[in-house]
């Protein structure tokens, strides 16, 4: 797929990565980690596009002509206007002495005002936000200006957008989501069905910016798919699934291969960061739980009648998320067995 922002050519220099939720735990860790890896201060590990320090490993970046870490340029939006250095210190994933080594690089990156409404995330406060007096259309135009300015400022030929924002409340698909014409009418009428996430994706599609939705918030609706396909814009994603659901899909696949029946699966998550605070709101919690719960039946190949997923905000955990799983299974001749997994991530 080709667009004015993303071309299928050999090597096009630096790649702009714009992030919704730039100062959040995941995004700030990503940017700080890349800065540290560029200086050789931490190992290049646990990435699909890097060789894990193996001398003879083939790099996917070379094979598929992906951008290297050295080519990445970061920008994005956040509800907090502090620098990435301040955000990274606050989240505490990397040690203060490590962050000191890349302080200048991180202090140079400050987020742009974000599109936000408490209607979609009750437990968040928006201090650094795009004005709402222009309605949905005005906010979309502000997003487009930010993307264009970022691209021009850094002399970039290509930009991608990644949604790492906190989870929005659960939304059902309605008529406004079904056609592009209806969606655009919803923009003009400030329809509440056009969420902040959807406004970002619409703006990205308008400029030909490929985008990935790393959050479970509803974005992959027919209207936006039509717009992306009309403009030749690649898109992907519906929740990153890097914690408990990562373990769940791996274990469920193994159980299916060994023909073990899953009788029940009880999952609990504890997290104490801003994402946990957002998920303490029942409306946002429902979005995440539905995303987590939806994966199991399709992987094990049968309906798991006793499948529970719970998410709790527990402030002492901070960014060190913890997941507990209790799995009840039936083995040979129906003999009961049980597995317990505790994943700190």
For every predicted segment, state its role.
Residues 1-215, 219-230, 250-251, 338-345:
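Metallocofactor- and cofactor-centric catalytic cores in central/energy metabolism, strongly enriched
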Residues 211-214, 235-239, 263:
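Short catalytic-loop micro-motif centered on adjacent basic/acidic residues
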Residues 18, 22-25, 87, 233, ...:
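Active-site-lining helix/loop region of Rossmann-like oxidoreductase modules
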Residues 48-53, 106, 191-193, 242-244, ...:
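Short C-terminal domain-edge/linker segments immediately following a structured domain
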């Amino acid at each position: 797929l080709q667009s004015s922002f993303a071309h299928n050519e050999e090597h096009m220099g630096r790649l702009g990565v714009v992030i919704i939720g730039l100062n959040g735990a995941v995004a700030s860790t990503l940017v700080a980690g890349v800065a540290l890896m560029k200086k050789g201060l931490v190992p290049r590990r646990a990435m699909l596009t890097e060789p894990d320090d193996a001398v003879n490993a083939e790099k996917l970046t070379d094979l598929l002509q992906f951008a290297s870490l050295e080519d990445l340029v970061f920008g994005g939006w956040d509800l907090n206007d502090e620098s990435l250095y301040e955000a990274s210190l606050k989240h505490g994933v990397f040690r203060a002495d490590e962050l000191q080594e890349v302080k200048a690089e991180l202090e140079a990156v400050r987020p742009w005002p974000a599109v936000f409404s408490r209607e979609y995330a009750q437990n968040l406060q928006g201090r650094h936000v795009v004005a709402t007096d222009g309605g949905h259309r005005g906010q979309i135009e502000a997003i487009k200006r930010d993307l264009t300015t970022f691209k021009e400022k850094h002399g970039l030929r290509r930009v991608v957008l990644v949604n790492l924002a906190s989870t929005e409340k659960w939304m059902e698909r309605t008529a406004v989501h079904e056609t592009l014409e209806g969606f655009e009418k919803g923009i003009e009428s400030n329809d509440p069905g056009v969420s902040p996430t959807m406004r970002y994706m619409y703006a990205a599609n308008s400029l030909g910016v490929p985008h990935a939705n790393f959050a479970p918030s509803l974005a992959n609706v027919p209207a936006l798919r039509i717009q992306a396909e009309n403009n030749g814009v690649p898109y992907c994603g519906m929740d990153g699934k890097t914690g408990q659901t990562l373990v769940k899909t791996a274990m469920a696949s193994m159980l299916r291969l060994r023909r073990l029946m899953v009788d029940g699966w009880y999952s609990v998550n504890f997290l104490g960061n801003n994402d946990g605070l957002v998920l303490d709101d029942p409306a946002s919690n429902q979005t995440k739980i539905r995303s987590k719960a939806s994966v199991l039946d399709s992987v094990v190949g049968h309906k798991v009648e006793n499948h529970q997923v719970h998410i709790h905000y527990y402030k002492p955990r901070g960014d060190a998320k913890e997941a507990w799983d209790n799995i009840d299974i039936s083995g040979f001749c129906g003999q009961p067995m049980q597995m317990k997994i505790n994943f700190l991530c």
